[in-house]
Amino acid sequence: MQARRLSLCCLAAASVVVGAQAVAGQGAAPQQGVTYRSPSGTTLRLMLDETNLGNEASVGEITFPPNQDSGEHAHDAIEIFYVVSGELEHVVNGKSQILKPGMSGFVRPPDKVRHKTGPAGAKVVVVWAPGIEGRRVASRWTREP
């Protein structure tokens, strides 16, 4: 029950972030957080993490370039995606779901997940609970100036 409430709180936090960006207009919203880049060019902007929210959850914005495949992996936390733009193929334990703008998907540990994009790439808001997972993902990527 506590995990479900935490997940709902995390999703609400993501909704606030997305809503604020929509009200401000695309590209006009001030940038919050620290951005990291993976070797494949995917970026993660951690907006809420242990520095300003604590360890309960972290919220980020991930921009996947066109035609990317994350490879199968697992997380030590619940991962919730909300698609802002583009399309994301969200494959959980071999079961594929195409997520379009306004749709969400999730994965629980120890599920295996894979994220794929088509020619348009994708921008998503991601919520991890517990929040240390956001920092764990970012630790393998390069911090942007």
Regions found by a protein language model. Give the residues of each.
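A short, N-terminal "cap"/entry segment at the start of jelly-roll beta-barrel domains
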Residues: 16-56, 137-145
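Ligand-binding loop in jelly-roll beta-barrel domains
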Residues: 54, 109-134
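Histidine-centered metal-chelating micro-motifs
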Residues: 69-70, 89, 105, 109-115
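Glycine- and acidic-residue-biased ligand/ion/polar-headgroup-sensing regions
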Residues: 76-88, 93
